[in-house]
Each structure stands twice: as structure tokens, then as C-alpha cells.
């Protein structure tokens, strides 16, 4: 776990999807499932992805009476580690679970013809344009940062929903690109984006959601909001 300071936000969570879950039934037969874990943002600790993967792997040769027993064990352990109740939902592959892939209902800004030369977070790039109050959703596939522990690249789609003065889209895209050489955890990057937008664009309402590509059978999808927008559903981004 890693201690983290969080913004005081009404609605936020980190949603993890796990695609490589397995354990043994009482007869020693392997069982497999997919899982969804919801970690509240007010937890005093965040769960580091590599250690989470090692924890999940520890189930591979452990016998359990049922999927419910596995779920209860994970919920107990993860809640104790995070310091707040962690939601756990497992689906056995034998139950034929389904998952949807889609794009946000919003405006993709990646095709803007911009010049980029900043590759560390540059919040001073953010600005608004003159105009009436708008409510819109902007998104980009160009968010890339690096894992704070391993230095490996983290790739994500980031979705920004807000109400307020129009955010300059070219400036926003340059800002997103500026994370390219930045070393920080997924959750911290999303919180940084949220706080920078709050400070420099001062929207009346704001939500920032990122869906990161999976590594080691896990993907992380942080969500930060002022409370004016609901938690998004678990629709996968195409690279997930």
C-alpha cells in the first residue's frame, strides 16, 4: 500500500477490473472468475497494482468452499489494507459473464492540430474561452504517464465532464500530453488533473474519469467528481 493525500471530494472511487482470478475448489479443481473491486477514495491507503497482483496470485493454490467464500476473503483483506470498505464482485466464467466496450458520449479532442513540447505536467496551459456557460464531455486517448514504482508506461483514455466557462480544447489536449514523462500512480494522475482543472478553469461542476489499459491482468479506472455527476458504469475502453 502507499499512503496518499486525497482531495475532499463528494463522489470518487477507484474501480479495478481483474481478469486473471483463480483458486481451487475443495477437491483441488481450479476455478476461474473475473472480478470488479471498488476502492473508496477516502481510504487512507491506495493499493499498489503489483502487490495487488501478487495477492491475487496467492489464491491460485488455495482451496475454498465457494466463490462467495473467495469474495468474502478478498473483501476482508482489501478493506483492512485500504482502511475503508472495499466492494468486491466476482463472476465465475462458468456463468458466461458479459462486458461491453464503448466510447463516451462526448467530444473526442485528439484530432486537434496542436504543437506539443511539454512532457511534464503543465497546469498553466489550462485556460477557458469567452462564452456562455456550457455543459459538455471531452475525452482523449492520449493520456500516458509512467508507473511510480516500475517506470513502465501507463496508457489511458481520460474523460472530462464539466459545467462552466468553455475549456479551451487545444490547451486541454496539450495539458493531457504533458503527463507523458510524468511518474505517478494512476489515481494520483487523475486527482492531479481534477485539481488542476478546478484551479485553472473553475468549473461549476466537474468529473474526471480515466480508464487505463490492463497490466498483469488488472486495469485501474479512477473517478473524481464534485458530486454533480454519477459514477460511470464499467464500460471498457477499446484498449481494455
Sequence positions of predicted segments:
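Histidine-centered catalytic/metal-coordination loop motif
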Residues: 13-77, 143-200, 213, 225-228
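Charged mid-protein connector segments
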Residues: 80-134
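Short terminal or interdomain "cap/linker" segment that borders an active site or interface and mediates
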Residues: 102-107, 125, 214-240
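Structured core elements
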Residues: 159-161, 207, 219-221
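Secondary-structure boundary elements
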Residues: 75-87, 129, 195-204
